[in-house]
Amino acid sequence: MMLMSENDCRIYREELAPKLPPRIFDAHVHIMRKEYFPEGFTFPERNTFNKFGGEFPVELWRKLMAEILPEQELWLNCFSAPHLQVDNDRTPEVEGEKEFAMAMVSPADTVETLARRIEAAKAVGVKPYLNYAAHVYGKKENDVEVFDMLTPEQLEYLNEKALAVTLHIPRSGRFADPLNQKQMIALCEKYPNVKFIFAHIGRAYFMRNILESNIEEFAKYPNVYFDTAMINSVEIVKYTYDHFPLERVLFGTDTPIALLRGKSVEINNQYAYLMGENYAIGSAIIDTSGVVEFTTFFYEQLRAMIAATPEKDLEKVLFTNAYKLFTGIRNA
């Protein structure tokens, strides 16, 4: 499939290519094949994966990255789709030094199951998700707590092996939620060898959420990282740099969602995805009349990173920070 429009090509040529480093490390990618699901499984009509034929294999990721970033060498850290019907024993099949994978994990998994899954895939860590915890504990998804997402036994194993966790924090308050803040800090203190990567900068997609966060408290914990997946806001990225070490900020995109056409915007202390395509993601507002010519969320994220990051530090955030983290885990 071809993704780029003439407008995308112009954006890359005029805005991105002159400023991007030669290598980019995307720390937040979902890779999934149809065979990860039961036979006959189909996604709802407006699910993002349907844009790509009902799956997003790593071969397609490689092809599309060569199209949208033709002058860059792409590295990735990836995980499967957090879906209750997915086979969590299927971790993305990555190859070579530039590709890393994490195993999906549910609180229902024994340590033995988790260890086997990680060792079989040579995974650098795990990706829990709130829907697994909700299912296991019989909670509504919005009632899930950070402590619900991994068991103490799983965390002890991850701490012993010094692996990483990419954690999408729960609850409607996101990074401003006092319980989230307390439990996130508690994990970092109790499991100092686990590299905690809080996805989407703690899901702080709008300014008030990060202003009411405790991001500065995490600066003293060397095992804490934040990824920037789906953050389109220059101001939020700048605020992060002002209150947390830039050397532990990881560029991430949330591909394949990031390959949809749209932009995340702040509206009245909330956020919404203005969309040029009719796919169901979060708080999407669809331009049904086709008035606006959108580029991809991927390019909007790169625009934000370039605008927010000092030129001398851009390569750190877009490549070096993730490179050091994930190669360090793999080579330990």
Where do the PLM segments sit?
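Active-site environment of divalent metal-dependent phosphoester hydrolases
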Residues: 30-35, 83-86, 108-110, 133-135, ...
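An N-terminally biased module of ancient metal coordination in phosphate/nucleic-acid-related enzymes
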Residues: 1-80
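Active-site neighborhood of phospho(di)ester-bond hydrolases with catalytic His/Asp-centered motifs
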Residues: 25-27, 78-79, 102-104, 127, ...
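Distinct, well-ordered alpha-helical segments
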Residues: 87-92, 111-119, 174-190, 205-218, ...
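Short, well-ordered coil/turn segments that N-cap beta-strands
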Residues: 20-23, 70-76, 96-101, 121-124, ...
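Active-site gating/metal-coordination segments in enzymes
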Residues: 3-8, 83-173, 220-224
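H/E-rich (His + Asp/Glu) clusters that bind or coordinate divalent metals
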Residues: 2-13, 201-332
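Histidine-centered catalytic micro-motifs
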Residues: 23-34, 165-169, 198-201
